[in-house]
Design a protein with these regions (language model features):
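Extracellular beta-strand/beta-solenoid scaffold signature
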Residues: 75-83, 103-111, 126-129, 133, ...
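Extracellular beta-strand solenoid repeats
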Residues: 47, 58, 66, 74, ...
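Acidic Gly/Asp/Thr-rich repetitive segments characteristic of extracellular carbohydrate-active
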Residues: 20-58
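Extracellular beta-strand-rich solenoid/capping regions of secreted or surface-exposed proteins
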Residues: 38-39, 53-64, 73-117, 129-135, ...
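Detector for repetitive beta-architecture
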Residues: 43-45, 50, 56, 62, ...
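Functionally critical loop-and-helix segments that line ligand-binding/catalytic clefts
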Residues: 246, 250, 273-281, 287, ...
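Bacterial N-terminal signal peptides
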Residues: 2-11
Length: 426
């Protein structure tokens, strides 16, 4: 396979020189690099001489552009840095820096407008958007690292935006201090083994279907994963912690149907799972199973009295409130079966790992914050806690049965497993 580089204005075979430090990187001619790319034949490997090149640059043929870790593409604060406008190209081992900051133009490190491209092992720094895919299918975006511009959250760009693009694989990437990772009108995409830190939405999927998010780590985002107006997504084996925004949700489902949420860790958030009119489509169900929902303010919250979600085999532990239903009503129109509850007060005389009596969660007077939004600020206040205690001790009104799990699992059941298999990272 031919390997080409620019030397003295000509395309010749070369051996790459040792990389210079960032401060010493020579500024080389972008016109010569663009000419080299344009001269390339399908399948050729283009290895530019080490150094720094001003963007924007365009890949319009199915070549392999390999910076070998020694090439920087610098947008100099204007526009997008690299455009991939073909099918079947590979872009790897580049450092891409300093895009513009214009949201109407979606200034990005790499813009993709084609199919079946591979974007791998690149470092993207100080760009508004990391990647932007529009009407581009079957691309692979893997092992890249993105560090967004130092801006206030609303002004940041997305680590990756996938718009009207299907069947892409986004795997083993690291997204730092962007705004969102977002899928719009996108189906059949896979988001695998990525790390997302310090953003607004770790993963935001809207008006899409049959996407898979598996094996990802989400830290310190304002919301972990949010599905809105979706159908058929699978959220599996993810580790979502410390969502610190105004809502502070590990996982939210809004008007989303036929969703599978399984074997995730959902911890240290205001709400582990927030359900908002989900499932939405008649005749559909959402399956929430095998998750560890732990150390949240509320384990599962419902915006209203909704139905047709099935909760099985989940571990609820360390949550201040297990389940909350706002605006009145209960969660009884959903199925609760075989979950483990750390405050279950029954026994297991048969020794089969299943409680002898159902686990029931009631709403007492002290939980007025569920019904009256303006009182939520006072949740946990001594007055409400005393009121709740007195109502439990001597009920002066009929408490609301929020849920009933007829087969609660107990701690002596060694076969019970919940949560992800991931090893947390700092």
């Amino acid at each position: 396979m031919a390997v080409l580089a620019v030397a003295g204005g000509l395309a010749v075979a070369v051996r790459a020189a040792a990389p210079a430090s960032v401060a010493e990187e020579p500024l080389l001619s972008p016109a010569l690099l663009q000419a080299l790319i344009d001269m390339g034949q399908p399948g050729q490997v283009i290895v530019p001489p080490p150094g720094r090149y001003r963007g924007p640059l365009r890949v319009t043929k199915p070549i392999i552009l390999d910076g070998q870790g020694k090439v920087t593409l610098d947008g100099d604060g204007t526009g997008s840095v690299l455009w991939v406008m073909t099918d079947g190209a590979t872009v790897r081992n580049l450092r891409i820096v300093n895009s513009g900051d214009e949201h109407p133009e979606q200034d990005a490190g790499i813009q993709v407008r084609g199919h079946a491209n591979v974007i791998e092992d690149n470092l993207i720094e100080n760009t508004l958007f990391g990647f932007s895919l529009e009407k581009s299918d079957r691309n692979i975006i893997r092992r890249n690292r993105y560090f967004g511009q130092d801006l206030e959250m609303p002004r940041r760009g997305d680590g990756i935006k996938v718009w009207y693009s299907n069947d892409n694989e986004i795997s083993d990437n690291e997204f730092n201090n962007g705004r969102d990772v977002v899928f719009w009108y996108a189906s059949g995409n896979k988001f695998l083994r990525n790390v997302e830190r310090g953003g607004r939405y770790g993963l935001h999927v809207m008006k899409s279907s049959e996407n898979l998010a598996e094996g990802n780590l989400f830290y310190d985002n304002m919301t972990g994963i949010s599905l809105m107006y979706d159908h058929g997504d699978v959220i599996r084996n993810n580790y979502i912690v410390r969502s610190t925004g105004t809502v502070g949700v590990c996982l939210s489902l809004k008007e989303s149907s036929d969703v599978v949420v399984e074997n995730n860790d959902l911890m240290y958030c205001a709400s582990g799972i927030a359900m908002d009119v989900s499932p939405y489509e008649p005749g559909t169900k959402n399956h929430i199973r095998g998750n560890r929902i732990a150390y949240n303010n509320v384990g599962v919250s419902f915006v209203n009295d909704w139905k047709d979600s099935i909760f099985t085999g989940n571990l609820f532990t360390g949550n201040i409130t297990e389940v909350a239903v706002y605006g009145g009503g209960s969660a009884m129109r959903n199925t609760w079966d075989g979950n483990r509850w750390d405050d279950y007060q029954g026994f297991d005389r048969a020794g089969d790992g299943i409680g002898d009596t159902p686990h029931r969660v009631y709403g007492y007077a002290g939980q007025v914050w569920m019904d009256v939004p303006n009182t939520r600020f006072f949740k946990g206040a001594p007055l409400l806690e005393v009121l709740d205690f007195l109502d439990r001790l001597a009920p002066f009104s009929e408490p609301t049965l929020l849920l009933e799990d007829k087969r609660p699992r107990l701690g002596n059941d060694k076969s019970f497993k919940a949560g992800s298999t991931l090893e947390p990272k700092s």
